[in-house]
Amino acid sequence: MVKRSAFHPATALLFSVLLTATVQAAVLPGNPVISRRAAAESMALLKNRNSTLPLIPADRVAAFGHGAVDFIGGGWGSGHVKTEYNANLNEALERQAEAGRIRYCPEAADAWGGDSKFRPDAAFVNHIRKQADTAVLVISRCSGESKDRSPGAGDWLLTVEEQELLQLLKKAKFRKLIVVLNTAGPVSTSELTDDAVDAILYASLPGMEGAHAAADLLTGTINPSGKLTDTWAVAYEDYPSSKDFIRTADFQEYEEDIFVGYRYFSTFDKEKHKVNFPFGHGLSYTMFEIAAPALSHENDTLVFRVPVTNIGDRSGREVVQLYVSAPQGKLGKPAMELAAFGKTRDLSPGERQELTLRVPLAQLASFDDTGRSGHEGCRVLEAGDYRFFPGNSSWDAIMHSPVLFRQEKLQIIFRASVRLKPSLLPRRLTADGSREALPVIRATAEKTVEIPHDRAIEIEAENFTAAHPNTGIEKFGNQGRRELRCVSRMDHRGRFVEYTLTVRQPGRYAIRFRVSNGRPALQDIMTCEVNGIAQPLRLDVPSTGNGPVRGEWYNFITLAPVTMKLPRGEVKLKLISNGTFINLDSFTIAPAQQSDVLFAAFDREHSRIPLPGFHKRERRFPPNGKIVYGTLRRYPEQLDAFLEQMSDDDLAQLLGGHAGSSHGSAGSLGACDVFEIPPYDTFDGPSGVRSFDSCTSWPCPALLAGSFDPELAETIGAALAREARLNRFDIWLAPGVNIHRNPLCGRNFEYLSEDPLLSGQMGAALARGAASENIAVTVKHFAANNREHRRFQTDSRISERALRDIYLRPFEIIVKEARPLFLMSSYNLLNGRKTAETPELLTGILRDEWKFTGTILSDWGNNSDHVYETLAGNTVKMERGNPAALLEAMRHGELTRGHLKRAAGYLVKSLLQVQLMREKQIKPAPDILPSPPEAGKLK
């Protein structure tokens, strides 16, 4: 038996171990059945020319492509799930043939089974054509953590081999040519839109049973009802974010602003020239009539009742998508925005259902970040006519007659308590197609520094008077009330900073730089120019590494001095990067002849002295004895006393993660034996329990969102949670709700959609489902984590409006609707600051505005500083903390014991709720109808 806690005997019964069997990862019975059904409910039928599908018993089917025998169930990285099997389409079609739904020729797919590099020629294809009249071509693409997708062949585009095979299949004139896209996200479909290709099924990364689900749809055993959660453009270059997504720069300029995905195309591509398949698109084998909604009001919510009738000859489900076209007002709006959605039950031919869709008025408001409405820093509902269009896709909706709601006057919905304005985003797209210039703060106010002849003087690196436009200023801490900043992002030859000096006494001066270098040692990092003349000096920088107090990027050291000549009068000192650079905090200048003495005097005057009288707190147990963790269950009001008895060391240790105690754990929280806090284990991933042994692989979240069915998402969340509990886990590191800004983000399959409402509501449903089966969730990655390339360094430069209306919106929905216990900050920078070190984001918005009371985890192994994380409101540093840095910061007054207690309080309250979950019995799986073809829809 694996021991999960070290409780005092008096509290052992209170915190009894849930399971006594040996820990062993396992697939919960029934979960593969749910996985298959969920995949089928989520896949989207993109094209079905002349009712090619569903296949019929007379169809003689052959499958082509390596993907037919190596069907991809999920991505790599945190999204990878080890499974007992991963069904492929070859075997799935064979099962359909055994059931009499088709006739199947396995010879084609078998050719790839024996040789993954098999390259068929015309003779092979024609040979198969004699046996089969229906060709199913499978195109597979994977994706994963730490690497983005490519716009080239083999990813967005077809490979040469795939193009050749497609042409061979077209020339062979199969009666039916069907393409199954087993891909991590959108790919180019321009070669598939001609009449030679009869049908396209988007299967995405559908989990271990996904191939069977695809076969169920191809044969009509299940009627497709999934929809696209992203816009599929004609060319990659048609996406507005494509111009800077794949470049190597350490920043992304979100110049498209709020016009992400279909918001962009509906506004600027009204002729529909740039889109092959729109957001929300997905066909059915039957037909539905969506009638005009009836509108009513309930307090501050608009209520739409939408009648839906199956007017076809097959049973099926339909998604009603309600879009709003808001008045342009003074702020400008996208042409269309998803306002609500709902999915019918399985409707028989002729059957009718009325869906009720609710739209809070607050949801229609826009954030005014520049004051155009007269209310800067507020979310406002502008006056005018709001037109609502129901439909089954973003294109279909606009064909329906609108329902009008009139807002008589501007209404302030919300006033922001903090601001997150960008400093380096020069412009943004507006609704009329023009670019609005934004204030760019490239340097501090121009300042001339006078160089004395009798002492040393320090110049802060950020006090430059000119700089390369991509040079950054990065906050790395506080000293009292003063923010500490450094110059960063000069890792390209030619980037520079320039300082204006006034020199009264010309001559040779010594200059020493205070730098941090998290890389291996660097040689000759910069060229120094004085009034345009390069100085004969060389600056080498050792690796500063991870110091006892600061992380690798802020562990500043002072280099040995170098010398240069400075003339009398105004001097322009220019520091030019020779390539790979460092973080530059400051530099000190003194006359060279006396530099040793003057630098020593400067150091004595500015030395970092511990607070007078500071003593590290040791443990102080109350008179009635030690309060242990279990006591808090009955007496939660003792939380402050519980924390107060801890030493500073205890608190610092508690604010870092620990090794996991379960098989395959990503790491644990708690684990303080002295106070009997057990370890609580976290686990990846978004598509299933990521363990060392086999578990269920589910449809990836991006596919699951295509179901447009929150009830189904709750079912998946609950089923996954039951399996996680069986495998002795506590905290799920999901859902991820970052927006699909660009189709090539490597982790898009882990996230949900390009739309914030769909992402938020489906993410909230997953969270509710998991919580219903006593697994806590961790919403991630907060925020704007939309690229994997150089993910530790990349800076997402976003306007405050786009941030609040698009990129933060899914997190806000989940925090308010599902009340998760945990949230994870992201690796990236947001408007020049690391998210885990940004108090405006973690405390101002998340806690103060949204009232989040849970625990904020850093992402695993990030390069943020633990001290500044704690000051910002990040609760626990994963997967390991830096307690020495926290204690050192307390010695020097940067942190107080109160900071540590506050963070520990959030953590302990969260863990107590996890403990309550842990103690509850694992519920048996609910009655689940067997997988098709044996049964109807999942309940």
Which residue ranges define each predicted feature?
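Short amphipathic beta-strand/extended segments with alternating polar/hydrophobic composition
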Residues: 342, 399-407, 537-541
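Extracytoplasmic
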Residues: 442-608
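Short, surface-exposed linear segments at secondary-structure transitions and domain or protein termini
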Residues: 238-241, 346-351, 409-417, 544-553, ...
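Glycoside hydrolase catalytic-domain context in secreted enzymes
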Residues: 1-7, 21-390, 394, 425-452, ...
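Short beta-strand elements
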Residues: 396-418
